[in-house]
């Protein structure tokens, strides 16, 4: 589950939340207190960390931590 832990680390740093709050079901806005700018900055940080690009239309569909994990698993080059 190293991927989740890497994603969790980025989220805790970007949103300044406790790691225990960052679960697969946690929604960025509702559960982690992010606003729309926070989410944009988080997506950018994840893109940089994992060397991927998340198009805007996909980013709009990412609402919780599990969505991020799935997107990165499906799109990260091995």
UniProtKB/Swiss-Prot annotation:
One of its GO terms (cellular component) is membrane. Pathway: Lipid metabolism; fatty acid biosynthesis. Transmembrane segments: none annotated. It is found in: Cytoplasm. SUPFAM superfamilies: ACP-like. GO terms for molecular function: acyl binding; acyl carrier activity. InterPro entries: ACP, ACP-like_sf, PP-bd_ACP, Ppantetheine_attach_site. Residues 1-76 form the Carrier domain. Its main location: cytoplasm. GO terms for biological process: lipid A biosynthetic process. The modification O-(pantetheine 4'-phosphoryl)serine is found at residue 36. It comes from the Bacteria. 4'-phosphopantetheine is transferred from CoA to a specific serine of apo-ACP by AcpS. This modification is essential for activity because fatty acids are bound in thioester linkage to the sulfhydryl of the prosthetic group. Keywords: Cytoplasm, Fatty acid biosynthesis, Fatty acid metabolism, Lipid biosynthesis, Lipid metabolism, Phosphopantetheine, Phosphoprotein. The keyword Phosphoprotein applies. Belongs to the acyl carrier protein (ACP) family. Carrier of the growing fatty acid chain in fatty acid biosynthesis. This is Acyl carrier protein. It comes from Helicobacter acinonychis (strain Sheeba).
